[in-house]
């Protein structure tokens, strides 16, 4: 699948986004900043990536996810949980970063701080109904209904 990637900040030429291994599901996003940003405990900031993408296919979207090591070891996660990039969005990718740790976290220029994965999307045709055509076994059970 072809996705156009536009480099908005020439500093990224030094460290182009790409897949780390043949089996990588996502590309690492780099902090496209001129100087380090310090996130205090409980603080949330938008970090520029210096790139824009053009998926141009409504059957796909992109998701921005935290890097597992940074989330687990440092407490750096996404402020919005997951970033969803629609297929028709063409602006710069910005990442909401949240520090859930007790320590200040430094985000350095060109640091790999998040990741981007392309995922398939199905757009549903919703039909307004009074009752569902079939009752599932689960029905309305939720929030621990099948066990905790």
From Swiss-Prot:
It comes from Francisella tularensis subsp. holarctica (strain LVS). One of its GO terms (biological process) is dUTP catabolic process. Its cofactor is Mg(2+). Substrate binds at residues 67-69, 80, 84-86, 94. It comes from the Bacteria. Belongs to the dUTPase family. Keywords: Hydrolase, Magnesium, Metal-binding, Nucleotide metabolism. The keyword Cytoplasm does not apply. The keyword tRNA processing does not apply. The gene is dut. This is Deoxyuridine 5'-triphosphate nucleotidohydrolase. It catalyses: dUTP + H2O = dUMP + diphosphate + H(+). Transmembrane segments: none annotated.
């Amino acid at each position: 699948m072809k996705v156009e990637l536009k480099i908005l900040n020439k500093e990224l030429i030094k460290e182009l986004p790409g897949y780390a291994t043949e089996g990588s599901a996502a590309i690492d996003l780099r902090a496209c900043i001129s100087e380090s940003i310090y996130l205090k405990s409980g603080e949330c900031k938008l970090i520029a990536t210096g790139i824009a993408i053009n998926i141009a296919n409504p059957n796909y979207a992109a998701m921005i996810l935290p890097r597992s090591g940074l989330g687990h070891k440092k407490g750096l996660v996404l402020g919005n949980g997951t970033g969803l990039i629609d297929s028709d969005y063409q602006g710069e990718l910005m990442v909401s970063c949240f520090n859930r740790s007790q320590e200040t976290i430094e985000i350095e220029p060109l640091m790999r701080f998040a990741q981007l994965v392309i995922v398939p999307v199905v757009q549903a045709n919703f039909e307004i109904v009074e009752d569902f055509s079939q009752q599932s076994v689960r029905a309305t059970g939720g929030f621990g209904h099948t066990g905790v």
